[in-house]
Regions:
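Charged low-complexity interaction tracts in eukaryotic proteins
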Residues: 3-33, 91-160
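Short amphipathic alpha-helical boundary/capping segments
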Residues: 37-38
Length: 166
């Protein structure tokens, strides 16, 4: 290969794709306006705050239901963000972030990354969150969310890896 620095290009593009697909899923959505999140910056901050919450719940091996996510958004909204939205709206906002933005409404997400060694594009699957059925008090059936490897890679690339390089 003439340019050695292009050797792991698909891996780099997978990381770029994690951001690209997330932004693409979020930027055109008008639903943000009904919750008072008009600026792209606000939207990205909330998405990552929700992802961090899901990660923390997973690391603690605790369930992370939509009720939990809604309560979390309500708490950070009341304490920090100050948007004029109700608890019910916070739950709807959580559902929007998790199921529309992060899960693409159940449709698979892909990003094409070029492989200079094979002279072709590689289609890379992207998935930020997954879910499983849990039973609360052995009776109530709920969906609990957790980050996938892609979700962890995205979150960890925002701070933890940079700190490890210092």
């Amino acid at each position: 290969m003439q340019y050695e620095f292009l050797k792991n290009f698909p891996k780099r593009m997978k990381n770029v794709g994690l951001y690209g697909v997330l932004i693409q899923n979020s930027i055109q959505k008008t639903s943000w306006k009904q919750f008072g999140f008009l600026k792209f910056d606000e939207q990205m901050n909330l998405i990552f705050a929700v992802m961090l919450y899901i990660m923390e719940q997973s690391l603690r091996e605790e369930n992370c239901t939509m009720d939990d996510i809604g309560a979390y958004i309500d708490t950070i909204n009341t304490r920090y963000l100050g948007k004029e939205i109700s608890y019910d709206d916070c739950r709807k906002l959580g559902d929007f972030v998790v199921n529309v933005i992060l899960s693409n409404e159940g449709r698979a997400m892909y990003f094409d990354g070029y492989d200079f060694e094979e002279n072709d594009y590689h289609v890379m699957h992207i998935s930020y969150v997954a879910n499983r059925i849990v039973y609360l008090d052995q009776e109530v059936r709920r969906t609990s969310y957790y980050l996938t490897d892609d979700g962890y890679n995205l979150i960890l690339s925002t701070l933890e890896i940079e700190n490890n390089m210092k």
